[in-house]
Amino acid sequence: SMGGVSIKLPAPAGFCDLSPGHPADNRALTEFGAASEKEAARLFGMSAACQQLADWRAGKRPLPDDRVHFQTSIANMTEVVASPKAFIHTMCALLRAKGNEFGSAAVPDVKSKIEGAVANVKVNSQEFVGVMAEDDTACYAARIMKMRTPTDGDKTHLHLTSITVLKNKGIYVFRYAPYTSADATLDVLGKLKDTIAALHAANK
């Protein structure tokens, strides 16, 4: 519950919820939960691609790459959002201003923004792509992260952020995926939009 309001967080299609009752899941939930608290945020749940989650639990792979995290800022937990539309547009404007800071706003089309961020990102850092889409139910932004791993070498990851309002509470839905191409990124964005639609349907 968020500030006394009960909110349902259904896992996206093909994803399964991490459970505190499973040791591997509990470790991840605890670690990501602690990282969120350091950013003055609260993690409410995580889900991952079902097959990746099963393999991870069996010790056959590292943490699933395809994940969804549901969280909010601690300030948002008690705040009642009177106008969801205004809240979303304000948050999107803040993200657009951040894009201006990094120069990504000067690039007109989304695919070029993504490819530019991938070209510029350094190892063990991240590059802000900018706002990817906005409508009355959510604002969507992206960043590209490149990490060096001991076993798999350099891995480039996509991190999509969506900001929405459920039952007058501001919620962040993060979608993590391996980066493969700009077109594949737009597919992941489409799936995240489906996740947001399902969240709204579950919390009418």
Language-model-derived ranges and their functions:
Residues S1-G14:
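Short N-terminal segments immediately surrounding and downstream of signal-peptide cleavage
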Residues V5, S73-A82, A177-L186:
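Second-shell loop/turn segments in exported
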Residues A11, S83-F87, M91, V188-T195:
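Stable alpha-helical elements in mature extracytoplasmic
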Residues A13-R27:
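Primarily extracytoplasmic ectodomains and periplasmic/lumenal surface modules that are beta-strand-rich
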Residues C16, K146-D152, P178-S181:
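Solvent-exposed loop/turn segments at secondary-structure junctions
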Residues T30-P150:
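Conserved polar/disulfide-associated segments of primarily extracytoplasmic proteins
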Residues K155-L166:
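Short, surface-exposed beta-strand/loop micro-motifs that present aromatic residues
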Residues N168-K204:
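Surface-exposed amphipathic alpha-helical segments
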